[in-house]
Amino acid sequence: GAPVCSPSRNVLMTGKHTGNCDVQDLKRVDAGENWRDLKGDWPIRTETYTLPEAMKKAGYATAVFGKWGIGDFGSTGAPDKHGVDRFYGYTDQKACHTYYPPYLWNDGKKEVLNTSLTAATIGHGSQPKGEVLADTYRAEQHSSDLIADKMLEFVKEKAHGKQPFFLYYAPLEPHVAMQPLQEWIDRYPREWDKSPYRGNRGYLPHPRPRAAYAGMISQMDHNVGRLLDTLKACGLDKNTIVIFTSDNGTTHDAGGV
């Protein structure tokens, strides 16, 4: 792996050492400032052979749900150019820094989700002085459960066919910004958090940073559990290999989490 996400995902999808990967840092195609129209990370090359391509060649249906991070649609690193039959989620690692993105990619089409909050940072020197409210940094549709729902639809569809499938589920959690649904925050004691996180180390402020971070992990755990339950309900649990791993290192130091 690598200490940051896009190079790690290049390693994961190709099996190469970081020194031999196309993506070795967080270099971008654009400046990364227009959150409503991010152009994507530096893409892998067309000739780079990926795990989905290998699985497709072996006769598997292939799908990716969540975070891709090695090429936007229209680039040489687009999922559909590297053996992915079904894609729903984020192609851009910077767009993944918010759980309320303006859109997600549904195969090669943009599915509009949110019209308000888009950026995952308030900018240096913009820390709120008064009360920090989680709702200030929320919008209409949270991406995590939407992605998980699409993933489960794929599993149920393929469960009735004869073709085996390869599924790469890449949830965003627990990457900051801290934006879990409130129901997951409320599961944890208020005394965990002595003070709010005001965004002074980057990303968005949050009134309960420790509970929020734990809530993101719980939300991810819940959706992984939904996947395992669906495999069992479809009679696939005894004939499916499940690998759980992470993409890179420790959390951003936001609010003492």
Feature annotation, model-predicted:
Residues 1-257:
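Formylglycine-dependent sulfatase
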